[in-house]
Design a protein with these regions (language model features):
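Extracytoplasmic/lumenal domain signature
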Residues: 1-42, 46, 63-219, 224-473
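Short glycine/Trp-rich loop-beta-loop segment that forms part of the substrate-binding cleft
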Residues: 53
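Segments forming glycine/polar-rich beta-alpha architectures that bind adenosine-containing cofactors
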Residues: 56
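Acidic glycine-/aspartate-rich tracts in secreted/extracellular proteins
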Residues: 59-60
Length: 473
């Protein structure tokens, strides 16, 4: 597998929107940086080779959150079993924005050494569901038996985030955090790494970084792992991009595992108007590069080997979603994203875009009138008008469509709700739209039958889980 190289077009030169940048390596600012091992994501189709959904949206391209195919007979959803969470500080419960369960089909020899129940150990092709909760716990379920596969990990602080597991098969869990305090307790905040043989935390990387220019420290986005160099990659609300050379040591015969991370961070300041530090969304990755946007609306392609921006552009409004990438047979690589009204207290056009991931050029922008209605009360609570959910890259019968869920849209009759838009990947023209009756920040999930028939599953702020026809909406 050979990934293409990226190089900025004239319109996407980093110096046009970035005022300065810096790299922290070994705890010190350095003038130049080069990773000790080549960090390159490799074939994205092999990320989930062991089976399952191992990170937010399935893999480094962040295209979907499903694995395998489905057989649909009745086109209805039903609850098989519900699992209750507890309540933390009489405030936090359930699963927050950006919280997606993982599904891990463990290798048999790994499963047998872990502290899961005997019933789950004996389940053929056992699939474990792992989901952190805002009640301060990380839950583990057996997807087949619908029972707990092992005890919850108790952190005691809100972790309504999406975790990730090591794609190489190592029994490692990487978990961020969205808050550091309750009314009675202030703890640590950052990235936790757990040994899933015994569920013990074996490393903690703080996000209270002296070099950070942002005022918040949450690590809400899900990390990804580049297996070749054993590198963990993630962003934080403090405005930094982190890479951790994990130096994992796994003794299969003795069932022991350890890590010895070396942290590197990339930060920057912007020259655009109203620049503010903060990263809400996570990274997508292709080849040597990671792609992410910030709360100002600066979208960057950063080389993981040099920790320098290859290209950067200003979207004009906040980018709060994790972008999606798509590779094409001719070598083209494209990025899909959208904006949210996080900078301005007004109503404005929401931008839905396709961008050349190798140059930073805008390929198209949706021309449909999508007016987001800014609401200060909702924004203060972290819910913004626009694209907070990650787009769904269509496959099967909808392989020509890109699906966006846009929150808090003002319709022609002045009513406000989320709207799902299906756009043509080539032109950006609207193929169909489906207004919901409430707001929604849920990233749509694509389900496909063997014949390519498509369905979309997504939730909303009213607590409804919807099944939609992917072809017609």
């Amino acid at each position: 597998y050979r990934a293409e190289k990226a190089s900025a077009s004239e319109s996407a030169l980093p110096e046009k929107v970035l005022k300065s940048s810096f790299v922290i390596s070994g705890g010190q600012k350095v003038d130049t940086y080069a990773s000790s091992e080549t960090v390159s994501m490799g074939d994205p189709n092999k990320y989930s080779a062991q089976g399952g959904v191992l990170t937010f949206r399935g893999g480094p391209l962040r295209q979907n959150a499903a694995y395998g195919t489905v057989e649909v007979t009745e086109e209805q959803l039903s609850v098989v079993r519900g699992m209750r969470t507890s309540r933390l500080d009489n405030t936090y419960t359930g699963f927050g924005f950006g919280s997606q369960p993982l599904i891990v089909k463990w290798y048999k020899n790994i499963r047998e050494m872990m502290n899961i129940t005997d019933e789950s150990k004996n389940t053929t092709a056992m699939k474990e569901v792992i989901v952190p909760s805002d009640d301060g716990k990380i839950y583990f379920y057996d997807l087949d038996t619908k029972a707990y596969s092992r005890p919850a990990i108790e952190i005691g602080l809100p972790v309504g985030v999406t975790a990730s597991v090591n794609p190489y098969g190592y029994p490692l869990l990487y978990v961020g955090q969205n808050a550091e305090a309750t009314s009675a307790y202030t703890g640590i905040i950052g990235m936790r790494i757990y040994n899933l043989i015994n569920q013990k935390m074996i490393d903690f990387e703080t996000s209270k970084d002296e070099a950070a220019l942002g005022k918040e420290d949450a690590v809400a986005p899900s990390s990804i792992v580049e297996s070749g160099s054993d590198t963990l990659v993630y962003t934080a609300k403090n405005g930094l991009l982190y890479t951790l050379a994990m130096n994992t040591s796994f003794d299969l015969n003795n069932a022991t595992i350890s890590v010895n991370p070396v942290k590197t961070a990339y930060g920057y300041t912007g020259s655009v108007r109203d620049f503010k530090q903060g990263i809400t969304g996570g990274v997508a990755s292709y080849g040597d590069y990671v792609y992410y946007g910030d709360d100002t609306g600066l979208l960057q392609c950063v080389d993981m080997n040099t920790m320098q921006a290859v290209w950067a552009i200003d979207l004009g409004e906040s980018m709060m979603c994790t972008p999606a990438l798509e590779t094409e047979e001719d070598g083209g690589v494209y990025l899909y994203t959208g904006t949210a009204l996080g900078k301005t207290g007004r109503s404005a056009q929401i931008r839905l875009l396709k961008i050349d991931a190798l140059t930073g050029d805008v390929v198209w922008e949706c021309q449909s009138a999508i007016k987001g209605k800014y609401a200060s009360k909702e924004a203060k609570a972290g819910s913004y008008a626009g694209v907070m959910a990650s787009p769904l890259v269509g496959e099967g019968e909808i392989n020509d469509l890109i699906i966006f869920n846009v929150n808090h849209v003002e319709l022609d009759d002045k009513s406000i709700c989320a709207v799902v838009y299906a756009l043509d990947k080539t032109t950006g023209e609207e193929v169909w739209n489906q207004p919901l009756d409430v707001d929604s920040k849920s990233s749509p999930i694509g389900l496909y039958q063997r014949d390519g028939k498509s369905y979309i599953v997504m939730g909303d702020d009213g607590g409804t889980l919807r099944l939609m026809d992917g072809f017609s909406g």
